[in-house]
Amino acid sequence: MLRFSTAGESHGESLIALVSGMPAGVPIDQDFVNRELWRRQQGYGRGGRMRIEQDTAHFLSGVRHGKTIGSPIAMEIENRDWKNWTEILPVETGDASKHKAVASPRPGHADLAGALKYDFAEARYVLERASARESTARVAAGAVAKSLLLELGIDVASHVVRVGNVEMERTATWAEIAALRELDEVMLGCVDAETEARMKAEVDRALLTKDTIGGVFEVVVHGAPAGIGTYANWDERLDGVLAQAVMSLQAVKAVEIGRGVTAAASMGSDVHDAIGYAAELPEGAHTRFTRERNNAGGIEGGISNGEDVVVRGYLKPISTLRQPLASVRFDTREETKAAYERSDVCVVPAAGVAAEAMVALAFGRLLLEKFGGDSLRELKRNYDGYLEQIRRF
């Protein structure tokens, strides 16, 4: 089974990503992994931390001579800001006067709930692990999963469809979405220039008012065949697995598959995707069964149906505010303002990149459970045999 875990704190020495269950023989390009980490750091409205960190992954195990070797893959991403925190967050007992307490919890963050759960006197240790800095390690792990999927002709990309009250009013093509990854300068990750300009104005408004702003990103899995996931068991349904994966990201408060939200207010005849059959296999398709639209988001009955898999994540505004909301001090219980920690104003494009990683890891897990294989060659034999089967159906 393809699994991953992460370790590390926001201002600790480094972050660790551990990926296990990866078949042997999968090519790993370190430049590709580092490019994914770079993409996560981009976007208009990011904070000062992104000017400090220049994330790169150092492979500790599991990859030799540019390929996976079947053993767990460990990666380390250095926190360059660590040098400023060595006395604040020492491993050994340190000078208490240098500790930087989070004395008043921030509404919307894990501060209060985490301090109550783990019996902390204040929220510093909660912040350190709950921070979205952890998603850096997820992106590194996701880059490994993407490398596997790409060997099978399956690609994963994202774009931003909404920031604040500005929403893109048309459907993006796969070519437009994929092209965003090639840009060397990222604004807000929207494929429509006019819409992106209005999105930027929304971020500027939040900057001027010392506020934060959320939005919606869309992740697309392109090139996947029908048959990933199952209706047979509740915890193996593809939509459920993807929703949990994306929902686990910091600040994501809702997940949508296909036209999930508006479908609830529509008639069935306007929602469901009629089925056709082509005389010849359409270019890029795995079967002759066709759809003229994709309201289902590529998933029916918990199983991929051969169309692009489309997942949207709804991101709340970042909870650290430069004009803090009312809170209460942990030590005195007196009313005060919430703590402020250096933060971003808008992270929707970066969250989309992190969601790509989670979707790739989740999709890769179900794919390996279906086709198996201790090596890439074995996996490809199994996969190619299945593709031939559904082509002939």
Curated annotation (Swiss-Prot):
Function recorded in the entry: This reaction introduces a second double bond into the aromatic ring system.
Taxonomic lineage of the native organism: Bacteria, Pseudomonadati, Acidobacteriota, Terriglobia, Terriglobales
Amino-acid positions noted as binding NADP(+) in the UniProt annotation, renumbered to this chain: R40, R46
Pathway the protein acts in: Metabolic intermediate biosynthesis; chorismate biosynthesis; chorismate from D-erythrose 4-phosphate and phosphoenolpyruvate: step 7/7
Pfam families listed in its UniProt record: Chorismate_synt (PF01264)
Top class in the EC scheme: lyase
Organism of this sequence: Acidobacterium capsulatum (strain ATCC 51196 / DSM 11244 / BCRC 80197 / JCM 7670 / NBRC 15755 / NCIMB 13165 / 161)
GO biological process, one term: aromatic amino acid family biosynthetic process
Entries under InterPro entries matching the protein: Chorismate_synth, Chorismate_synth_AroC_sf, Chorismate_synthase_CS
Annotated NCBIfam families: aroC, PRK05382.1
Database matches in CDD domains: Chorismate_synthase
Cofactor binding notes: Reduced FMN (FMNH(2)).
Entry GO MF terms: chorismate synthase activity; FMN binding
Gene that encodes the chain: aroC
GO CC entries: cytosol
Cofactor: FMNH2
Entry protein name: Chorismate synthase
Family indicated by similarity: Belongs to the chorismate synthase family.
Recorded catalytic activity of this chain's protein: 5-O-(1-carboxyvinyl)-3-phosphoshikimate = chorismate + phosphate
EC id: 4.2.3.5
Keyword Amino-acid biosynthesis listed: yes
Binding site for FMN: R129, A130, S131, Q250, A251, G301, K316, P317, I318, S319, T320, R342
